[in-house]
Amino acid sequence: MEFNEKLQELRKQKGLTQEELAKELFVSRTAISKWESGRGYPNIESLKLIAKFFSVTVDELLSSNEALTLAEESQKETEKHYHNLVF
């Protein structure tokens, strides 16, 4: 099961609308909609907040491919940050 499907399932299990979940996570309803439709992914901080809110781990939220992609993107951002500090 992919992240978008898991998020929607968890939200519905709690009986929340996208708007209600958005308020709990301090994001827009549009962000929730994009995440649930697979048109976008939350950043790592939002993923941590989602996991905490639903009492699951980040690993449980992501498929192995999604976790790998997220790790690679995080590494690129870190490298970019260090590059900017050095130069």
Show the residue positions of the predicted features.
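Short basic helix-loop element that most often maps to the first helix and adjoining turn
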Residues: 5-20
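Alpha-helical residues within the helix-turn-helix
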Residues: 12, 23, 34, 52
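Short coil turns linking two alpha-helices in DNA-binding domains
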Residues: 17, 28-31, 43, 57
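Recognition helix of helix-turn-helix/homeodomain-like DNA-binding domains
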Residues: 25-41, 63
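Hydrophobic micro-packing sites on short alpha-helices
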Residues: 42, 46-54, 60-62
